[in-house]
């Protein structure tokens, strides 16, 4: 196989900021903890060793998620390793694009696999596990409901009214798969793969579950563990962060300060920050939370909470909260975002 390199600054799909980061990382020195270099991981791992994590919780939730799908041998080893103090994870995440959607979806997962393999070789005393997180709480249905195959657009038709996409039913997915088979033709090797996806769709109770099963089938032999974060045990563990954000608007000042510093370097801000960057699940839909005086109102509903009532709601029902579409809470994450050595990369212990 012949592999040719291509200069980052010649790839038009990259933004000005992305190109600058690759070519002149020092420009962003004030915003990153570690340089995107393989040697940086020695420091990252040392730092993460000091961080308290709930390994048992992660192991338990993932074990439950795979109860029906089952685990490949490589996945079993990785899942068991999560309980060990010398295990760390490389995480990448993406919204649940239709049948993986853009090729970038696949690239991100392979980048996590590749990085995990490199780190396992460089640090043989550590166990590095690749993880893919499904961003199923996103509500931007138009962003995930289509794909292009051989220059033909295939669209998933499904009634959508501000529900988190991961919680949608799989109604209409069978029709999507039929269209894919018609384009591929029966003689295509991919035809059998799509037939297996039909079985996955038929046995799935939600779109998130279908995406979980599909990604797992594609990458289980590489040891990738697929995680859907829209789980009550995860949110229960996360409720102190939810309280800080909703009751104290904790992220706003931090993000605004960082955005201002980035703009001073002639780069655009990446997100719009609100006073409250969580939404509330109400009757299957996600609704914004707004503070009016000393009352927390759920937009477009008749629900409202005092400060004490909201605190109790979070404590008793953390699963009713969710991230805004572009979470501003990365400053508080206990996790890692490691898409590849070609993008911002960190390492974390399993949690």
Which residues fall in each region the model found?
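N-terminal targeting/trafficking signals and adjacent low-complexity tails
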Residues: 1-351
């Amino acid at each position: 196989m012949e592999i040719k390199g291509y200069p980052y600054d010649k790839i038009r799909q990259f933004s000005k900021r992305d190109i600058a980061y690759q070519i002149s990382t020092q420009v962003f020195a004030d915003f990153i903890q570690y340089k995107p270099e393989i040697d940086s991981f020695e420091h990252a791992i040392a730092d993460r060793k000091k961080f308290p994590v709930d390994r048992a919780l992660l192991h338990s939730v993932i074990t439950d998620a795979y109860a029906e799908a089952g685990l490949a041998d490589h996945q079993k080893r990785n899942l068991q390793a999560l309980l060990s103090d010398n295990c760390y994870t490389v995480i990448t995440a993406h919204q649940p694009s239709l049948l993986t959607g853009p090729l970038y979806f696949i690239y991100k997962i392979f980048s996590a696999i590749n990085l995990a393999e490199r780190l396992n070789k460089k640090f043989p005393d550590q166990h590095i596990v690749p993880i893919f997180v499904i961003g199923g709480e996103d509500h931007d249905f138009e962003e995930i409901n289509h794909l292009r195959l051989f220059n033909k657009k295939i669209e998933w038709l499904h009634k959508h009214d501000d529900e988190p996409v991961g919680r949608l039913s799989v109604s209409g997915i069978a029709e999507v798969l039929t269209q894919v088979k018609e384009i591929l033709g029966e003689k295509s090797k991919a035809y059998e793969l799509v037939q297996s996806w039909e079985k996955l769709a038929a046995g799935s109770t939600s779109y998130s579950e279908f995406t979980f099963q599909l990604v797992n089938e594609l990458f289980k032999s590489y040891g990738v563990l697929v995680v859907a974060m829209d789980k009550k045990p995860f949110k229960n563990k996360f409720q102190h962060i939810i309280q800080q954000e909703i009751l104290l608007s904790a992220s706003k000042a931090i993000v605004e300060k960082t955005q201002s510093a980035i703009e001073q370097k002639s780069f655009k801000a990446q997100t719009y920050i609100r006073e409250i960057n969580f939404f509330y699940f109400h009757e299957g839909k996600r609704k914004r939370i707004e503070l009016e005086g000393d009352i927390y109102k759920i937009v477009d509903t008749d629900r409202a909470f005092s400060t004490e009532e909201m605190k109790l709601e979070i404590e008793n029902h953390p699963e009713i909260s969710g991230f805004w579409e572009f979470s501003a809470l990365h400053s508080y994450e206990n996790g890692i975002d490691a898409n590849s050595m070609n993008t911002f990369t960190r390492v974390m212990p399993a949690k």
